C-alpha cells in the first residue's frame, strides 16, 4: 500500500471459527488491505468445505476419545471454536440439506463476524461457492438462504466460485440477488 497506494489489495481467509486453525487474523490484516474475501464455503464431503471440516473434526474427537459421543463432541467443537449449533440440524446431519434454523444460527453468526472482522460491509467481498471436486454440493435452496442472510446483514457484493457447470436453478438464485451494473 505504501508503494502503490492506488492499487486495491484484498485477501482471502477462512470463516471466523477456523481462523485459529489457519493462522488468519483478519482484524489485524485490516490495516494492510482494502477489502477481505472470506470464504462462504459451506459444502461437505470430498474436498471439505466448512460443514465437511466440522464433521471431520467432530468425528476425529469421537474416534480419539473413548466414551465421547457425537453430541458431546459437537458441543465441544461449538465451544472451542465459538461456533453456534442449531438444535434442528446436528453435525451428524451435515451431509444433508440444512434447516432454516442453521441459517439463522451458524450462517448468521459467521457472516456477522466476517463483516466485523473485515472492517464493515464496504470492505467485505466474500467468496461464495457450492462445491469442490468430489464434495456434496449445496442446493439452490441453501445458496438462496446463504445469500439472503448475507444481504440481510448488508453484504453489497460477493464473488461466485464454481469449478463445474452452473445449473439453471443456481443461476436463478444468483440473479435474484444481483444488481445491474451502471456504466
Model-derived features with residue positions:
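Glycan-processing catalytic domains of CAZymes
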Residues: 1-183
